[in-house]
A protein has these predicted regions:
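N-terminal Sec signal peptide and the immediately downstream disordered periplasmic leader
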Residues: 1-66, 72-80, 190, 241, ...
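Acidic, small-polar-rich N-terminal luminal/periplasmic segments of exported/outer-membrane proteins
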Residues: 32-166
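Structural signature of outer-membrane beta-barrel domains
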Residues: 44, 89, 178-180, 206-210, ...
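Transmembrane beta-barrel architecture of outer-membrane proteins
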Residues: 66, 90, 111, 154, ...
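Transmembrane beta-barrel wall of Gram-negative outer-membrane proteins
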Residues: 170-172, 177-208, 212-257, 287, ...
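Flexible, surface-exposed loop regions and adjacent strand-edge segments
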Residues: 217-222, 252, 261-271, 309, ...
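Flexible loop and strand-edge segments within Gram-negative outer membrane beta-barrel domains
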Residues: 244, 248-286, 337-341
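Face-selective signature of the C-terminal outer-membrane beta-barrel domain
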Residues: 247-250, 284-315, 336-361
Length: 361
């Protein structure tokens, strides 16, 4: 994980002060009162102190303070959660030592499930995307199979995004600048179009030059750079008080040259130079469409969660990190890895949960 110097500039859109985020209570006069964090670990909103499970919730303030941009930045931030890196672009979750058995199999389901707003994300490559307009993140220690399905033996990571509201036009923009020409722009705006319909637009754009040169590739070729963007539109329709529909459409693109892997037999001793002649690159595209319908009965809540997800990944890298002549002399040949992976998934889930004091099974 790369650490870079940075400066951040923020502004609020719409000329209004943002209200406290969902799940974070406004400051009170009593120093003995704890802030309230609302979690959905059991598929229903409840205070984290009342949730009967091992759960860690990270509100947006904590994510900003620790510069959490993506899943890899959670490593070391949550007890018992470990983020492993495979080939520089794929990140594997494990909780309490239980996780992905084969990190090289990018399409295999892990033992720690990933969800966004309660919707299952079947492809572990989704972890390579940036966290976009996040309200809070919940980490539930396993087993969680009863609530989240067979892929949650180790636990579950649930990313809760900021939802549209009807109260006001509001938003934010952050610009982060850093070393290696880092430019990171995050922005979001909430637009209430009527008393029953509102949308929220969000975007995350990041560019940073690589810090290692592949000296034998023609031109100024740097490894481990970043050229990513991630956009989302979320719409809320609530014609009556006890019924709502939330739909979202998002697209993300991750482009980077192959990760730096300095071979101990590299004749160039400069750690910022790699004697490689292979112009490796990784390119990931993901499109996600979701629809969540919620109806509140007097004693129970019914929810339908639907999604269509498509991901395409392509790329290649040099296993040796050397030129072909050097690799041939040392190993008898070069080993270049090529990746082409496509994943298409349709998910559908129905939840029926009782309210406090309501009927139970």
């Amino acid at each position: 994980m790369r650490r870079t110097g940075k400066q951040t500039v923020s502004c609020i859109l719409g000329g209004v002060v943002l209200a406290p985020l969902v799940g974070i209570a406004a400051p009170t006069d009593s120093s003995d009162e704890l802030d309230s964090i609302i979690v959905v670990g059991q598929k229903e909103n409840q205070g984290i102190q009342r949730a009967p499970e091992a759960i860690t919730a990270l509100p947006t303030e904590v994510l900003k303070q620790n510069v959490v941009r993506s899943a890899e930045d959670l490593d070391g931030l949550v007890p018992s959660l470990v983020i492993g890196e495979s080939d520089g672009y794929n990140f594997d979750l494990s909780i309490r030592g239980i996780g992905l058995n084969s990190p090289q199999d990018d399409g295999s389901p892990a033992s720690v499930s990933v969800h966004q707003n309660g919707i299952f994300m079947p492809n572990p490559l989704a972890l390579s995307l940036s966290f976009l307009d996040v309200d809070h993140i919940e980490v539930l220690r396993g087993p969680q199979g009863t609530v989240f399905g067979q892929n949650a033996v180790g636990g579950t990571l649930n990313i809760i995004t900021v939802q549209p509201t009807f109260d006001a036009v509001k938003g934010y923009s952050d610009v982060e600048l850093g070393s290696f020409d880092l430019t990171h722009l995050r922005t979001a705006v909430n637009l209430p179009l009527s008393s029953t319909f509102a949308i929220r637009l969000a975007g995350d754009f990041i560019k940073q030059d690589g810090y290692v040169s592949a000296t034998q590739v023609p031109g100024d070729y740097h490894l481990n750079d970043t050229h990513n963007y991630h956009v989302r539109m979320t719409a809320l329709f609530q014609p009556i008080e006890n019924f709502s529909v939330v739909g979202s459409l998002e697209y993300a693109k991750v482009v980077q040259h192959e990760p730096e892997s300095k071979n101990i037999l590299d004749p160039n001793t400069n750690p910022y130079d790699e004697t490689s002649d292979w112009p490796g690159v990784y390119d990931i595209d993901q499109t996600i469409a979701t629809l969540t319908a919620t109806y509140d009965f007097s004693a129970m809540t019914f929810k339908s969660l639907s999604s269509v997800q498509y991901m395409n990944q392509g790329g290649s890298n040099s296993e040796s990190g050397l030129t072909v002549p050097i690799a041939t002399n040392l190993y008898g040949g070069e080993n270049d890895q090529f990746v082409l992976h496509q994943n298409y998934a349709v998910t559908q889930e129905f939840d029926l949960s009782s309210k406090p004091g309501g009927p139970t099974c």
